[in-house]
Structure formats: structure tokens, C-alpha cells
Amino acid sequence: MGLKFELLKTSGNARRGRIYLPHGVVETPTFMPVGTNANVKLMTPKLLDEIGAQIILGNAFHLYLKPGLDVFRFHGGIHNFMNWQKPVLTDSGGFQVFSLREGRKITEDGVLIRSPLDGSKHMITPELSMEIQHAIGSDIVMAFDYCAEPGISHQDAVVALELTSLWAERSLKKLRSLSDQAIFGIVQGAFFKDLRLRSAKEITSMNFDGFAIGGLSVGEEYDITLDMTKFTAPLLPENKPRYFMGAGSPKLIVDLVDSGIDMFDSVLPTRVARHGQALTWKGKLNIRSAKYKFSKEPIDESCGCYTCKNFSRSYIRHLFDRGEVLGQILLTIHNLHFMMDLSKKIRESIENDTFQELRGEVLKYYA
């Protein structure tokens, strides 16, 4: 079984759906915590399950470097390796084309990238990316793409688009020769609408199980991100999942749902937690602030997470003040619980046709 998608309800452009995968059902819209190295930082699989995470994301390139494909084959895939029995989506390594630019070489065949671990060179092709993701055993595989950096010329964006389409075709062909894992195609096109249109036509003409919007939220202005998404999302098939790659702020998430997006991922909630920032229903809260030294309140009184049920702002501030890792753990639990709660409330609001009210509430505190 690869993937089955049901579109249960729409409210304006917002979509309430359900994805059936080999390791479970995913209710959408949904936020996916990022577990780059087969772990979500500072979280156990049990904790992830308890906060309501439905699906997590792993990074194919990093997992290919360490622990290596032989380890995944030995364990029978990532689910057994990390003891997470719910769905996993893997990024193809296309983002590393963008992020690991030093010493890279891009050809029609693939991308020569330096390992951030030891500087060794690796030629990543669409075929190798599929072999990696097949060995990892992810429920959703991403096609290998060229995520171009912001600010490139129209001419260079055309090259990136054409390589993305070529590599998408090769990714699909290779994966189908290996397994029936679900695979998503990725629409690129930088910040040019004519190229987004062309990319969407080319990628959606292929028999992918779902589609992603890539190459956005990579440093450009917010208005550009949203404008490109609102333009691109309607070009994707209604009967397949739509995934925006790299969105973790509550504001962006409600605006993406309002644009017709079903899935999103980001390291943002876990990263800001490690720096003392909590996400709450009344905006961001910096737990390091001196004003919380004598506070008995939880991070968020309306939150039902383990952290908010058991610990005060004063205690968590003390942990950060003393450099205790428990503070980072407790805030990570809270922030990911908040993201799951936000996703759940979004789903309920679409069912009840109250999504715009919820969106307005979020935008009031995350302007």
C-alpha cells in the first residue's frame, strides 16, 4: 500500500483531509516535527506519541551519511531503528542542494555535495536518493529536486526548474522499480509565477501520490512566500495531499491552510524552545525574562501538556538560568504540543466552518 487520500471537507480554501499510510492514518491539516537524524531533538518517540504527533520527518541525506544505509537494512527500516511505529516522511536531499552550497557541483546527472561531517564528496543522483529513501523505509518519499537560492535570475530559475522536472521523472521511475512507497513531486520555480505555473504543469502531469511546494520560506519576505503559495496551491490536484516544505510559525501555518495546504514541517518550534522561547495561545513568551522569576503560572494556562500541568514559569526559567537541559526538554514538549493542538483546532474549525475566526485569533497574537 502506498497512499490513499480523502478530502473530507472544505471551508473556503481550507481543506480537511485524511491520509492513509502503511504505518497509520494522518488527519490533515497537520504539522510534522522534524527528526533530521532519526530523532526529534530532546524528544523520545513515546513523548511524541503522547503529544499527538501523527507523522515525523527525517532527512535522507543526513541519514545516508550517518548511520548509513547498511544500518537501516540491518534493522529493517527507520521505524524499527528508532522505535517509532507511526508514519515517516523523508526529505530527498534536495534542500541540501540549497543549504550546502560550498564546493557543490550541479550537473544533469545530479549534485556533488560535500559532507558537513568530514568534507567527503558525495554524488547524489535522483536514483541514489530513491535507494536511500527505500532503505530508510519511509511512508512518504520525496522526489529529488533542485531547491534554488532566493534572488536567482529568471534564467537560472529556468535551469533549476528543468532539472527538477527531469529529476522528478527519474525519481518516480527508480522508486517504482524498488517499491510501492508513496512519493510526492515538488513544484519549484523560485519567485516567478510563469515558472511556478510551468513547474506545476510538468510535475502534476506525472503520477505522484501527492505534491509539495518547494523553494519558499528560504529567507524571502513573508508577502512573497504567501503570494507564491496562493498562486501555486490551486494549480495542484484537489484529490491529492498538498505539502508546503518548511513552515513552522503559527502565522504562516494558518495562512497556508487558508491557501489550501494540508501538510507542513519545520524545526522552528523545537529550535526556539532550546533558546527559551515558548509558543502560546497569546503569542510568544521568553521564559528567560526576569519577570517570571516569581511566577507560579504555567507557560500557558489553556495548555494540557505535561510541562504546563506540572511546572511553573519560575521553575523553567531557573532551569534555563542554570543551563539545565531539562528546561529545553520541557519547552520542547510544550512547543510541539502547541503545534499539535493548533493543527487539531484548525481541523475542527474547518469541520465547523469557523476557520476564519480561529485564523483571526492566531493572527492577533502572531502578527
UniProtKB/Swiss-Prot annotation:
Record: residues binding Zn(2+): C303, C305, C308, H334
EC number(s) reported in the record: 2.4.2.29
Catalytic residues (positions): D91 (proton acceptor), D265 (nucleophile)
GO cellular component: cytosol
Pathway entry: tRNA modification; tRNA-queuosine biosynthesis
Domain of life: Bacteria
Named cofactor requirement(s): Zn(2+)
Cofactor detail note: Binds 1 zinc ion per subunit.
GO biological process, alphabetically ordered: queuosine biosynthetic process; tRNA wobble guanine modification; tRNA-guanine transglycosylation
Binding sites annotated in the UniProt record for substrate: D91, S92, G93, G94, F95, D145, Q188, G215
UniProt region (RNA binding), positions on chain: 270-274
Keywords: Glycosyltransferase, Metal-binding, Queuosine biosynthesis, Transferase, tRNA processing, Zinc
Family annotation (Gene3D superfamilies): Queuine tRNA-ribosyltransferase-like
GO terms, molecular function: metal ion binding; tRNA-guanosine(34) queuine transglycosylase activity
Keyword Glycosyltransferase in annotation: yes
Catalytic reactions on record: 7-aminomethyl-7-carbaguanine + guanosine(34) in tRNA = 7-aminomethyl-7-carbaguanosine(34) in tRNA + guanine
Top EC class for this record: transferase
Keyword Cell inner membrane tagged: no
Cited SUPFAM superfamilies: tRNA-guanine transglycosylase (SSF51713)
Job description of the protein: Catalyzes the base-exchange of a guanine (G) residue with the queuine precursor 7-aminomethyl-7-deazaguanine (PreQ1) at position 34 (anticodon wobble position) in tRNAs with GU(N) anticodons (tRNA-Asp, -Asn, -His and -Tyr). Catalysis occurs through a double-displacement mechanism. The nucleophile active site attacks the C1' of nucleotide 34 to detach the guanine base from the RNA, forming a covalent enzyme-RNA intermediate. The proton acceptor active site deprotonates the incoming PreQ1, allowing a nucleophilic attack on the C1' of the ribose to form the product.
Membership in a protein family: Belongs to the queuine tRNA-ribosyltransferase family.
Complexes and interactors: Homodimer. Within each dimer, one monomer is responsible for RNA recognition and catalysis, while the other monomer binds to the replacement base PreQ1.
The name this protein goes by in its record: Queuine tRNA-ribosyltransferase
Source taxonomy: Bacteria, Thermotogati, Thermotogota, Thermotogae, Thermotogales
Gene (UniProt): tgt
